[in-house]
Amino acid sequence: MINLRRFTKFTLAGLTALSLLGGCSVTPKVALQPVSVENASDAKAWELKGKLLIRTNGDKVSANLFWLNTPDNAELRLTSMLGTTVLLLTQNRDGATLEVDGKRYSDLSPQRLLDGLSGFTLPIDALPFWITGQPMAGDEVEFDTLNRPKTIISADGEWTINISSWQTQSGAPVPRMLELTHASAVIKLQTNEWQALANATGSKGAR
């Protein structure tokens, strides 16, 4: 198990502030191009840049966040202010690989890999939906006056997601500020850029 306190010290060493890291995207096997979509759910693929803060049992992890999400591949990268990668999670149809603190771990399940990071569970399967304002099947949802999700309670009751602000990115409304609360952790997410992507061969991004 990866100790969160050790990971926190590694992440925050020498840091006094955070700034968004640009240009850290990866090149997927299939060429992708930016597209506009009406809703986030219309995007077959997307990339996100923002900031992440995790608090748990007195520990705190702050990092820049880059996330590339496609039907066949995914990459989640956390970096320091100086651009140093402190966590890299990659996933394809063959399984997942986690690189952290100079070590590499592999598993068929990305969820099991991240569960080893600390005593709490980061909901990696649900996050791509919640971070784009989409409840999952069975979730309890409270809507705001514009009929956008304001509060989402996961189907198992373990997570509460509060969306405090929205923005328009790639033509679609997506959350800007989220707070995910669990009995063992609080996760704050800030989305600075969200870009819908489609195959460069002509797909328009709609499913």
Swiss-Prot record:
HAMAP family: LolB. It comes from the Bacteria. It comes from Shewanella amazonensis (strain ATCC BAA-1098 / SB2B). Transmembrane segments: none annotated. GO terms for biological process: lipoprotein localization to outer membrane; protein transport. GO terms for cellular component: cell outer membrane. NCBIfam families: lolB (TIGR00548). Monomer. Belongs to the LolB family. The keyword Iron does not apply. This is Outer-membrane lipoprotein LolB. Disulfide bonds: none annotated. InterPro entries: LolA/LolB/LppX (IPR029046), OM_lipoprot_LolB (IPR004565). Residues 1-23 form the signal peptide.
